[in-house]
Amino acid sequence: MAREYKIEDYRNFGIMAHIDAGKTTTTERILYYTGKSHKIGEVHDGAATMDWMEQEQERGITITSAATTTYWKGRDGKTRRFNIIDTPGHVDFTIEVERSLRVLDGAIALLDANAGVEPQTETVWRQAEKYNVPRMIFCNKMDKTGADFYRSVEMIKTRLGATAVVMQLPIGAETEFKGVIDLIEMNALIWRDESLGAQWDVVEIPEDMKAKAEEYREKLIETVVEIDEAATEAYLEGNLPDNDQIRALVRRGTIDVKFHPMFCGTAFKNKGVQPLLDAVVDYLPSPLDIPAIKGIDFKTDAEIERHADDSEPLSMLAFKIMNDPFVGSLTFARIYSGKLEKGASVMNTVKDKRERVGRMLQMHSNSREDIEEAFAGDIVALAGLKETTTGDTLCDPLKPVILERMEFPEPVIQIAIEPKTKGDQEKMGLALNRLAAEDPSFRVKTDQESGQTIIAGMGELHLDIIVDRMRREFKVEATVGAPQVAYRETITRLTEKDYTHKKQSGGTGQFARVKIVFEPNPEGDDFKFESKIVGGSVPKEYIPGVQKGIESVLSSGPLAGFPMLGVKATLIDGAFHDVDSSVLAFEIASRACFREAAREAGAQLLEPMMKVEVVTPEDYVGDVIGDLNSRRGQIQGQEARGIAVVINANVPLANMFKYVDNLRSMSQGRAQYTMTFDHYAPVPSNVAQEIQAKYSGQK
């Protein structure tokens, strides 16, 4: 089977947004106008095609990034293939956003025209910057009360530090919003309400908007010519670029992430979606426009590149594992190079295991189509893989490569969980392990002493949904304990310790002496080990044992048994015995050495501090600030946003449980908040004593 669409006609993109910016609705409209969805699904009634897990339909928020393939005929009459990844906007699911951004070539950032740049918009924007994803901006909900396109443009500059290139101006706003001005063609598009947005009239720019349109077209040209020397010179000499040249410059600047073309409309009222789809074709990159993916040669460790080309060796990245009720476990993968056939044997280089591709599916939200072959640039769902987890590389066994791994955040909250009936214990273990394979920001462990199962994740909502999915998908009812904070411990001062481990009980004994300097790691939260042994007082082959011994103690700190952060250990001296010394003896010595040193080095308890942003009507500002202060919060500042006030604070996670209920009652349901992990900070001594008393009894 030959490739149906050329790779330059592919657009792999996602839609990223704040929780209520209208992402699912916009995706729905795209599916509707591209002919894949015959009935428009509204999130309000829980029937959107992309939101296909039951909890998403109930909560009206998108949780899993479903991948959808659809097609669009551009302005030139040529059909392009769109692979759309739907990304979640709720902060507890930022891991999903990271995963999707990793495999996208471009993105549409949605803004709510009333709120502009919201906290979660900043979070997903920063994640997109990390992966250097070209972005366009769609200012949605122009029909909403308080919609302000020009304020949103300004906020992109002040909040995100980015340059928005305005491509359209809105005609009217709020209930009067009826169309847009196209600043390249310099005409107006007015939608016909009765045709569900399928038809619009191209008319002259309204008289009262001509001057503004001229002003913004000039700004547009000034910004885009800056990226090209010849275009700048021509412009300075009074030669303006023609429309095709403007489009070419906008495309280049977007792909190089110099600026972001900005459009507007209202997906819910079906206005502005088709020009946005034309813009995806015109300005977002094809797989050929982005740099070749880099990887490490599996055998030699040399850096290699894989280009988006069917004739190159197969390389792909697994970016999502999902349980499908009909097919079982599905692995979503992006093919970067080469082609893949159903039934093929592929190499998982991260696990060093071979896998066989059973079925290969093209996904449309929650319906599927079996395919025999897939090519570079495709996003496919594979059934039958046993070993592969998120972030693994799959490739040609004869040309193995490891593509760069994704980074996953550490969980900040944990709860104990147990099945309601003893008979469900095994079923629960299976369900939790299956869910952990799907979601690397979710962890499962057994508490060694109490034997309890502990689950950890990115927030209360994250863990709520895990428990909910266990009930729905695996039919396991579970009881959960109170949420517990993922505290950490560290040391605060330098200490030097000399320790000798000696054991003699007939036959071979054990002997190891170590002298180690322990101090806070100036480079961050990781553990750092150095050896400054000269003259062989500790033979080279025993030094890994010294490091391993210290690392084994780091998982349980001296104060309350929490994992330790930010420790640096330097081995400066030691002694060994020709017969009695071994790697194990040095491991035991360094372990005991660190245990003794940790308290002397000023052990300190750390707690996760959350960045909290509360948006509240002015009437409740005093109450909100007073309440945050009572939670040991540090107010970082406040600013007006329209008629509301935005309060920024750093608050310990321990004091934020059930905050949503308090905030609702305090503001009569009118205030909202978002919370993201910010950093670990020392716990005040009075609170630390309580925590130690509580946990040392348990450990």
Curated annotation (Swiss-Prot):
Residues 8-288 form the tr-type G domain. GTP binds at residues 17-24, 86-90, 140-143. This is Elongation factor G. NCBIfam families: EF-G, PRK12740.1-5, small_GTP. It comes from the Bacteria. Signal peptide: none annotated. Its main location: cytoplasm. SMART domains: EFG_C, EFG_IV. It holds the Pfam family EFG_IV. InterPro entries: EF-G-like_DII, EFG_II, EFG_III, EFG_III/V, EFG_IV, EFG_V, EFG_V-like, G_TR_CS. SUPFAM superfamilies: EF-G C-terminal domain-like (SSF54980), P-loop containing nucleoside triphosphate hydrolases (SSF52540), Ribosomal protein S5 domain 2-like (SSF54211), Translation proteins (SSF50447). Catalyzes the GTP-dependent ribosomal translocation step during translation elongation. During this step, the ribosome changes from the pre-translocational (PRE) to the post-translocational (POST) state as the newly formed A-site-bound peptidyl-tRNA and P-site-bound deacylated tRNA move to the P and E sites, respectively. Catalyzes the coordinated movement of the two tRNA molecules, the mRNA and conformational changes in the ribosome.
